[in-house]
Amino acid sequence: MSLRLRSACLILPLALCLAGAALAQEAPAAGASAEAVVAAGSGDAWVDRQLLDIDRYAARYPDSFLDEVARYAQLPRGYAEALLRERRWPPRDIYFACFLAKAARLPYREVVRARTSAGPAASWAEVANALQVEPGSLPYRALRHAIVASYDHWDRPIVLDALLRRQLGDRAQRDPSAAQ
């Protein structure tokens, strides 16, 4: 067997393994429908984009994701883990549920029950409306601010929309205020 052919036989399987691993990192969470991957359905396009990115972040750094919801949304870590691993909730749904609950001053279990009762076909906007929390309301604003804060905690880049830029400024402006 020539050296070139032998090299190709060794390199090709390695390349296929690496390509498979790269594709797996971008795969949706188990149990997530293809529709859910296209849009999280919060009623706010900016929030939807961030929630889908949170799915990617949580797939790569599940412990950091769970720490974030436990620490800043006061969701017990064991409960978040159960939603993620046993009930197969996508990270975006866990994040949205717990930070919406915190922003609207609702018990997190009430928001989780509302989501579960509505079923997988229901959007988060429908669930939030049923809880009397409409997109554009103050709790939604607090949710948007929480997303920015999470990205800052994770030291993850985020593109703010015009409203958030006016409210929060850029990262350099947010960092000194976060330290206080």
Question: Where are the language model's segments positioned?
Answer:
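N-terminal secretory signal peptides that target proteins for export/translocation
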Residues: M1-R4
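Bacterial N-terminal signal peptides
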Residues: A8-A19
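A generic alpha-helix preference that emphasizes hydrophobic side chains
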Residues: A19-L23, P91
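Boundary at the C-terminal end of the N-terminal hydrophobic targeting segment
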Residues: A22-A36
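Conserved, charge-rich beta-strand/loop surface module that forms ligand/interface-binding patches
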Residues: P28-A29, G41, A45
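Terminal, positively biased "leader/anchor" segments
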Residues: E35-V38, E110
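Mature extracellular/secreted ectodomains of secretory-pathway proteins
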Residues: G43-A179
